[in-house]
Each structure stands twice: as structure tokens, then as C-alpha cells.
Amino acid sequence: MRIPTYDFGSKFSVVQEVMRLQTVKHFLEPVLEPLIRKVVKEEVELALGKHLAGIKWICEKETHPLESRNLQLKFLNNLSLPVFTSARIEGDEGQAIRVGLIDPSTGQIFSSGPASSAKLEVFVVEGDFNSVSDWTDEDIRNNIVREREGKKPLLNGNVFAVLNDGIGVMDEISFTDNSSWTRSRKFRLGVRIVDQFDYVKIREAITESFVVRDHRGELYKKHHPPSLFDEVWRLEKIGKDGAFHRRLNLSNINTVKDFLTHFHLNSSKLRQVLGTGMSSKMWEITLDHARSCVLDSSVHVYQAPGFQKKTAVVFNVVAQVLGLLVDFQYIPAEKLSEIEKAQAEVMVIDALSHLNEVISYDDEVSMMRNVLNAPASQGSVAGIDYSGLSLTSLDGYGFVSSLHNTAECSGKHSDDVDMEVTPHGLYEDYDNLWNCSHILGLEEPQSELQSALDDFMSQKNASVGGKAHSKRWTKLFSVSRWLSVFKYVKLGKI
């Protein structure tokens, strides 16, 4: 009987290998198991998400059956014009161009489904392309403008964008060539969807036509609106170094401010400076452009010598008459008669020769506040003599009532308020009163008024207070009312 033999060496090595694997498994399993679980979980969630999104889109299509071209792209802001080559194409107020995916049935942004995150492409079409009709894909293809032979692509920059919840932003795009060589001499921008979607057609968006100029022309472009300190050739129909520009420079009209100032001072003379080469239509275009200039709110007040006291003209930074200050009342320009407007314009011309006598305010409100609330003892406000003004005429502005309210709040009776004013201007009005009444055939008021004035002045010089103080002011107010009536009669306003 033969005794079997065993290769204990090989079996021992097998046992060692098994033990080694068990050891590796013991150490690696705690590390690998969480990692594998995480990877599997992410893949499952991703697949499940795609599956659910597809189910949602199918449900939406079943609930709201989609028709051909049921969605459309639309530019959400206008292009900023003019457009120059190599310059960034911008929307209103320098913003990036924004495109929205619109549901025409609601007019709202379509922000659900795969189409709301589709890829967009910007392209160029002919300026005479009919963007009103319901164009076809073939119409678009036939009107796309390509670059000229040997030139760079017509659009430079990132011509692709992606919708985010139905809105896309087209940024950093510029033209490399002008539009003068095309059949319409204009371009339109278009945007279309690059991706294709089942059962869905999306209409392209097309802008209005516009001219693309060479960037060298940007140095000579007009400003809309112009600035007061822009050179005058920035106005429409006035070319740089052209005939109109030279004529204006010879008359020392160098800026838009100069142009507007001369227009308000003497429009017919300004028209003569430009000459017959500027037609009436061109003149209106230039003038409308100049008038679109944004002016500051400052106002300027001036009382010209030789005019009635208590009368001053109010004008703005370009010498336009805003109104008159007459007898402590502000009369806006639209309420002035033609004669008063002519007088006001003469006063403005005189003011420009006496700028040191012009008083400026931030706006009309601050002007009225300074004029109406100025202390009576000043005798003069904004260069206007108000020394003879009766306080009753201020009641319409709430001045007297506020004065009494102030006295009451401070614990004083209104009779105790010091309202001492020396009515110098009153004598001047009185001196002219007899002549006025005599010419008009009115009864001579001299004796009665003289008596009232003498009584007032005698009380003024005496040390009288309280009710007597109020009584003599009442008399003065009555006299002032008489003077107002006779003054209005003299001016023919009654």
C-alpha cells in the first residue's frame, strides 16, 4: 500500500495569500464602501432627475398641446444708437443686450422646460428685411449678411449665449465692418435658437434696422442729448469745420450754451448768422436738438436801472426769461404780455453786461423763499427795492399769518411783535399819485392821504406801543391799499 504524499509548501503559500487578501479587505472595505455608495447615489440621482424632467415635459405637452412656433424670442431692450465698428453693441443706458423667450399666449417669459435653457446665436440680416410678416426659415437664410471677401467675420466676440430661465444676455459683441456696402446700407441683428426641440418651434427675434458707421466717425458723432459745454458742431446739421460751424465761430458762438443763449436773446440774428444755406427744416432740426440739452435748475435775478423799482427779471443759465418779479409777486413767462416779455428780454441783455449785479439761486423755490422771507428791514431783496412794501401784500403768501403764529408760539401778543418798517417807497408812490388821478379825472386824494401819513408819522415818532402800535399800522395798510388801487389804474389793469 502506497502512502500519499502532500506538497505542504504550495498549500501553505495559498493559505498565506488568502490571509493577505482578508487583511487587505479588512482595511480597504471601510474606505471603499462609502466612496462607492456616494458615486452610485450621484449617478442614480442624475439619471432619475433626467427621467423626471422628461416626464414633466411630456406631461406639460399633454396638458398644453404645443403648436408650431408657439414660442418666440424677443429683444427686451433697444439698441443704443449710433453703432460704430469695433465698439461694443449696447442696449439702452449702456446695458447689455437682453433676449427673452416669450409665450405669445400670455406675453410672459417662458421659464420652464428644456427650451428655457436653450443655446442662442446672434446673426446679422439685411436692413430691408421684412420683420413684420411671418417669415420662414428660408427667408432668414436668404437675408443673412456675411462678411465681405477677405474680411474678418462680421460680428466679433461671443455670438453665442445660453438662456437662463428664459432670459439670455448678449455681451461683448461688436461689428468689424460698416453697413455702407450692403444693398440697404443698414443692418439688423437677429437671435435664434441653436438647439432643436420636438414639437416646439421658436420664432427668431429681429431688431429694427440701423446704420453701422466706421469707428473713425465716432470722433464726430452728435450727442443725444447735447451738453451745454459741447462744441456747437455737436448739434445736428452743423458739421465740424463746415460752413455753419465757421459762421458761428466768427460770431463767437462756440458751444451749445452760446447757441441757446443767442437764440433766446435774438433768434432772428442767430438765424442770419447761419445764412440762407440752412433751410427752415434744417433750422428746426438743429434747434430741437439744442433744446433737448438738459439745463440745471439755477435761476438768476437782476433789476435793471431805468426800470420801475420793485421789478426784476428772472432768467436761466441760457438767458431764457423765466418770469418777472413785480411788486413782490412772481409772474411766470407764460403769463407775461408781449410788451412785458420784450421788456424782460431787454433786462436780460443788460444783466449780461452787469453780471456782478446778478443774484443767483439754486432754483425757483429757493429764490421765492429768499425773496418772500427776507426781513423787511433789509429794504432790498435780490437787488429789488421793497422798502415801501406794505405787509398786507404778503398775506397771500402766508407771511403775515406765519408772523403772528410765531409770536403766539413764543408767548407774545401779535401787537408786541416789532414790525417797524420805514416806508421810504411809499412817498415815491404818493408823489406820483396826484398826477395819475388828475390825468384819469379821479378825485384828488391828496388831503386825505396826507392826513393819514402825517398821523402815521406823528405816532411813529412818539413812544407808543400795544394797541396804538397796531392802530397806526392799520392806517398804513389802508394807505397802501389806496396806493395799490391807484397804481393799477395808472397801469391800466383796472
Curated annotation (Swiss-Prot):
Protein localization: Nucleus
GO MF annotation list: calmodulin binding; DNA binding
Pfam families: Calmod_bind_C, Calmod_bind_M, Calmodulin_bind
GO biological process, one term: negative regulation of defense response to bacterium
Annotated segments matching region Calmodulin-binding: 1-62
GO cellular component: nucleus
Tissue expression per record: Expressed in stems, flowers and root.
Chain intervals for the UniProt region annotation (DNA-binding): 132-252
Record keywords: Activator, Calmodulin-binding, DNA-binding, Nucleus, Transcription, Transcription regulation
Main localization category: nucleus
Record's function text: Transcription activator that binds DNA in a sequence-specific manner, likely 5'-GAAATTTTGG-3', to promote the expression of target genes.
Family: Belongs to the plant ACBP60 protein family.
Subunit structure: Interacts with calmodulin (CaM).
Name of the protein described by the UniProt record: Calmodulin-binding protein 60 A
UniProt organism field: Arabidopsis thaliana
